[in-house]
Amino acid sequence: MIEFSCNRTSEDMTPVIRDIEIAKFAQTVLYDYRPELLTYTSYGDDPYYEPALLDPYDFAQNYLGSNIEVHDIYTETKGELIAGAAVFNYQKVKVFDKDNMCTREILVPPNTILLDNETVDHWHKGFEFFTIMHECGHLMLHQRVYRRELVQGFYTTGNVPDSSENAVLCKRSNIGGTRRTGLSTNEDFREHQANTFAGCMLMPPRVFIPYVQKQMRKYDRFEDELMVTRTINDGSGEYWRYVDVVNRTARHFGVSYKAVRVQLAKYGLQADPKDERVKEAKRRLKLYQSLWK
């Protein structure tokens, strides 16, 4: 297994790292795990891209060696629904016992991914897969923040299995790969980093970019292989072309519509021609293409 390392960290060991560096790390991990996830077929002058798809359960269990458990994760904070959790050390987690209609604590072992029943049973499959990879991101990127050594029955920082320092409980509102704006705390940055890792694992730029460009070339009104951004149904042809490409891509990669839109922006594949950020989008596209060119 490829181990993550980072030369720059904050005081609490949160990595200080750019998104492109996380993308490079994710690409290295994919090469080590299943290199075919970074390949596509090509036929003559009209390439036909069919990237292989990552199985988050297989990656978490067989590559990271993590356990995956599903519970009704309980939180006392009103309106704060938990999608999943990454457990680094032995941790007591409060769950809801539907059989007895009460809450109880369970002791969760290290290197465990918890999924809430709502995440698995009622949400889009893409959200479930993204949540698993988000938690894998925490387990791979943030060991130095949370991991404690157990020596003769005691952690090096104290025997505290009920401490919140042993696990990351991730709110549903934080899952999905939001763009890098409004980040102020180290926790914010760690959530962003986990989202970035998940997005780059499920939609690797090496295959995602050519696949999307193939879909875009079906419409001759996209300029310079940049999609016209249309987030509101204004009845224009650009809006429906945008929706079609995003939906096709989401279905193929097994992710949500929202997750695709985030990666399109991150990789520089979408911009509004009336916006000055077109140049920035083109710079991003070249940057992520440099991962394999």
For the regions a language model picked out, list residue spans one by one.
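Active-site hotspot residues in diverse enzymes, especially metal/ion-binding acidic/histidine motifs
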Residues: 1-293
